[in-house]
Amino acid sequence: MGQYKIWVDADACPNPIKEILFRAAERKSLPLVLVANQMLRVPPSPYISQVRVGSGFDVADQYIVNHVEPTHLVITADIPLAAQVIEKGALALNPRGELYTTDNIRQKLTMRDFMEDLRSSGVHTGGPDALSAADKQAFANSLDKWLVRV
């Protein structure tokens, strides 16, 4: 079993969530890897790194799936990526603090597919609400629960 590590699907991860993760990585001396198809600003730290992948559909997701291990945590709002991470035995947490599990991922995928079908048929479904202070707190609380095990 490898060491604990946090992976971030960083292209769509909100900056306030990245800031929480930067502080946690420093506090716990824990590797944090941000994967994106563009260069990101990350603080200088021996614990924080970034991987820039090529542009293209799901390139960052595939990189994460290829490198994730069961002791790792992946931060993503991408439900198909979360499903793949769970299949590999790792944990996935969204930026609003909701842990994806084997119990809830199938329902999440079904709802995502349903919403995608609605959008493709021309129905305007709107996007997610802006990240609130309560969302940031929920994320920090969920992250702390995982960090206690590290």
UniProtKB/Swiss-Prot annotation:
This is UPF0178 protein Shewana3_1627. Belongs to the UPF0178 family. It holds the Pfam family DUF188. It comes from Shewanella sp. (strain ANA-3). HAMAP family: UPF0178 (MF_00489). PANTHER family: UPF0178 PROTEIN YAII. Disulfide bonds: none annotated. InterPro entries: UPF0178. NCBIfam families: PRK00124.1.
